[in-house]
Amino acid sequence: MALKTIESNDIHLVATYNIKYDDNSNGKNSWNVRKDAMIELLHSLSPDILGIQEGLIHQVEFLDSKMSSHKYVGVGRDDGNRKGEHCAIYFKRKKYKLLKNSTFWLSENPDKVSVGWDAALERICTYALLENIKDGNKIW
């Protein structure tokens, strides 16, 4: 039986990180204390695709500035633009081409800012369809 050699473009290193929204009243767990360790970890992992949760726009943009090999998609849950927490997806721009992306609200009205069912706040889901530049394979 022949074994197929796995090529590097067949492997997708995917990570997720709940970065916790910036709450300055959180003392030793505040964003300013956590952010450098997070960047160090992400640089050591070097994920091809990274999903984050709870990122406020300044956190999303900070991460974007520190991960220059990546591009991100995602919007804030409070206005569908920049306000509120983001569930952003970062992907390596030299490995993937973005084909499609969107964010929807987990509610009876998924296409607009809304609170669903028994939730206290808006909840969102961001998705992206990426194409591997080397082989044309697609990944959601």
Whereabouts are the PLM-identified features?
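N-terminal, active-site-proximal structural segment of metallo-dependent hydrolase catalytic domains
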Residues: 1-66, 77-85
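Structured beta-strand-rich core segments of catalytic domains in phosphoester-bond hydrolases
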Residues: 49-140
